[in-house]
Amino acid sequence: MRKKWFEEQIVEFKTRSDNEVLEYLSSYWNITPDAKGVLTMVGTYKKADHKDKKGNDFAYFEDIRNTEGDILYYPFGFGKVKLWTTCNDKLEKQDIWRINVKLSPKKFRDKNPFIISLADTNFGLPSTNLKDKLSRESQIRKIFKDTGFTERDAKNTVNALHNIMDDLYSNADDRFVYELLQNADDQPEEGQLVSVILQLLKEHLLFMHNGRVFDTDDVDSICSIGDSTKRKDKEKIGYKGIGFKSVFTGSDTVIINSGNYSFAFDKYSPVYGDADMNNIPWQLKPIWQERYRYPKEVKENETFWEERVGISLEVEEDNLNDYRMSIARIFTHPIFLLFLKNVTNLEFDEGELRTKISKSHDGDILRIEKDGIVDSSWVVKDYPIIIPQEIRDALQDDHNVPEKLKKATMTQISFAAKVEDGKIVKLDNSVLYAYLPTSVNDFGFNFIVNADFLLAANREQLHVKKIWNQFLFSEIGKLLIDWVASLSTVIPSYLEILPNSLLNEEETGILSLSTFFNKAFTEALESESFIRVSDEEAVKQEEIVIDKTGLSEIIGSELFLNILGSDKHLPFDSIDKSVFNNKIFEKVEKVTSDTVIPKMIGNARFVEWFKSTDDENRNNFYNWLISKDCDRRRANIMSLVDNLPIYKFGDVFFSKGETISDLNK
């Protein structure tokens, strides 16, 4: 079918004028002719190793390219462009020359209506940028050749690749978006933040960003398994070297355009011929891709060429809606932006519908916006952590630990709590973050914690028995109290962030990490001053007392504590005292009516308060006392009342007992 169509096109082009043929060629090759119809190209000069039919030496230009460096093929299957020329010793000084060509006279275009020939003998030097591009192309071709060089190596690589991808991404329809986001976040242009655009076309999904263009190390990394350049770079959040492979779970043709790189991973490329693709690691074999031969809707997409990095995933029509739903699902809850270091703006373009999300700081608050409207607000704090020498020593022999962690002396743990109208919004079983969300929500945190966790290859689960993760959980338990204390002056409900009780523990499985959290958390809970008692002061939990009676709200904190004979403090008025019912505060002293009423009897300062306060407060006290009446307290209440100066004669107060005594005199 394709061959027949080619033949029909060739016949049709033979009837066209030279100008029409030239116009088609210039558009096809992405070359603009001058006023005389001359096209500028570059080619490699070669002297033939044999003579022509007349016994003369001759030469030719091969590897003909446009000035952008794309190899030129004639349309409709006529093969690569090649140009004949006379021998020229001066051209042997270097391989590549800039040349001028024109459409050959019609008598030479009987079989191929597009044949071109040299327009003149004015040869020039190619640009430095072109030389760089040719170097990049050479790298791509070498990787393609070397990867799976023997049949045995190819089969082993395929098996390893399939095992990894089956384990990682069999149940992760949208994981590839996170992996591409991570790559973009790890690739900022120096001094700039990163903006990402996802665009869904009729047959392709485009992922584009304005970060740093690919270099040789980046290319080597994505063309290998587990050989990530990020393993040694402490500024980058990834390190596995296999995240990019997630794009192949839904696409068999992936094109990358970045800087002077243009290549594809293509399961159906003609370069494989009739080979059994089950035995070829095509996901690791890059194929150089001339830009003028990109799929039409990608080639015509202006944004794809404007951004520094463009990735195109070919999507089957039946899967388009799945991609649309996966991305929409991610955009519905854009809190994944919280801990990304460099990505601050993200756009999803579906054609008629566009969704934009971004993050920005407003003082202590980090806001995430969706289409210009605040979607959520967060208080976030980062803690730089010194890594103890014993932890560093323990990491050295673990092959699962990236080199950047083995050499690191510092790491970072971050906390985030959602806030609305100045109050904490508790989250339900939030997942742990390793800059992007994992699937671990077993700990029931109502806040978000982010750290350099050692993750399984799919970036969704934690390595449970790794000493590094155990160390991080200890630090999280300790720092949680400090973070909460730092919020006490700005968020009155700050104590609600804390877990109600210690985390559930188990000997094996993910909750075995709870042991390390609980130990450090308990120690910090008892040793840190984090309960605010005034605008200026916070104290330890052993230094507070909780008024379960409500009396302090009537008579004031100072008098209440005097009645108790206590040098402790009552929590600040803005704190919701119900939080102290949680199990983590079970050691905090709680004062009940059974305790305080007997201590009020005969207390001189309380009597003075009673005399000097106003009628409203006295009435509030009476109502309070009535509300506490019950059989077990009645005797103490009666005794308290008998000793209260409830009778006033002139400016003098008398208790019931004093009044009766005076009357009997």
Segments the model singles out, each with a brief description of its role:
Residues L168-V196, G243-G250:
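Conserved ATP-binding N-box helix of the HATPase_c
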Residues M1, G77-K80, G124-Q139, K145-F149, ...:
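GHKL/Bergerat-fold ATPase module
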Residues A59-R65:
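Short, acidic/hydrophobic/Gly-rich beta-strand patch recurrent on exposed beta strands
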Residues F207-K267, V271-G273:
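Flexible ATP-lid and adjacent glycine-rich G1/G2 motifs of the Bergerat
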Residues S104-P126:
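OB-fold/S1-family single-stranded nucleic acid-binding modules
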Residues F149-E179:
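Conserved short strand/loop->alpha-helix "switch" segment adjacent to the catalytic nucleotide/phosphoryl-transfer site
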Residues E8-V11, T15, E23-N56:
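Structural detector for short beta-strands of small beta-barrel domains
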